[in-house]
Design a protein with these regions (language model features):
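Short, acidic, metal-binding catalytic loop of nucleotide-sugar glycosyltransferases
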Residues: 3, 22-35
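Short aromatic/hydrophobic "clamp" motif used to bind/position activated sugar donors
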Residues: 65
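The conserved acidic donor/metal-binding loop of glycosyltransferases
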Residues: 69-73
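Conserved donor NDP-sugar-binding/catalytic core segment of glycosyltransferases
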Residues: 79-108
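A recurrent flexible, glycine/aromatic-enriched loop bordering the glycosyltransferase active site
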Residues: 115-136
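Acidic donor-binding loop at a coil-to-helix junction in glycosyltransferase catalytic cores
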Residues: 151-157
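Catalytic donor-sugar/metal-binding loop of nucleotide-sugar-dependent glycosyltransferases
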Residues: 160-177
Length: 188
């Protein structure tokens, strides 16, 4: 069996099963015929999100890996665009994101020459180093470890990845949609 180009990794919790079903249906529909594997990991909250991310990363087989949280969504051409971008040999596949932090929205431009924690620019463009939602070369991603915690594990991981990325492919498309609402967060 041929290895996939892209592994999409989705950590989840039982409280978000309906959102997971919608997300995986969207991904299954758009990945038909493409070299994409979609993996999710749910449990009874015995593992932190950091440990779930590490477990998914360990079993991923794609040339590139990208995480999508169960309460996020992606563009209709997410899989096709990443597969097209993955034809080149780079460290990370970068793109743009719509980020909603509580009621403030920003376009996030992920590029390797941006700061890790670029200033959030409501109603503007936030420039950030590529986080775990971008598609990272698996061998590089596996050199980094998500910390065993429920919140902030992604920031800990990206600070390690920052040292490894040298070459990117970039699409100006908005491929990922992130939404955070303090009152709805399950990261406790």
């Amino acid at each position: 069996m041929k290895l996939p180009l892209i592994s999409i990794l989705i950590p989840t919790v039982p409280e978000r099963v309906e959102q997971l079903i919608q997300l995986t249906a969207l991904l299954f529909n758009q990945s038909t015929g493409l070299p994409v594997e979609i993996l999710s990991l749910s449990d009874n909250r015995a593992r932190s999100i950091g440990m779930k991310r590490n477990a998914l990363l360990h079993i991923a087989r794609g040339k590139y890996i990208a995480f999508i949280d169960d309460d996020d969504t992606v563009a209709d051409d997410y899989c096709a665009t990443l597969c097209d971008m993955a034809k080149v040999d780079v460290d990370v596949l970068c793109f743009n994101q719509i980020s909603r932090w509580n009621k403030e929205e920003s376009i996030v431009e992920f590029r390797i020459d941006h700061a890790i924690f670029g200033q959030y620019m409501p109603a503007g463009i936030t420039k950030r180093f590529p986080w775990h939602v971008c598609a990272w070369r698996r061998e590089l991603a596996q050199q980094c470890v998500f910390t065993d915690k429920q919140w902030g594990e992604d920031a800990d991981w990206v600070m390690q990845a920052f040292e490894l990325a040298r070459v990117e492919a970039y699409s100006p498309k908005i491929l990922h949609y992130y939404a955070h609402m303090d009152e709805a967060s399950l990261a406790k």
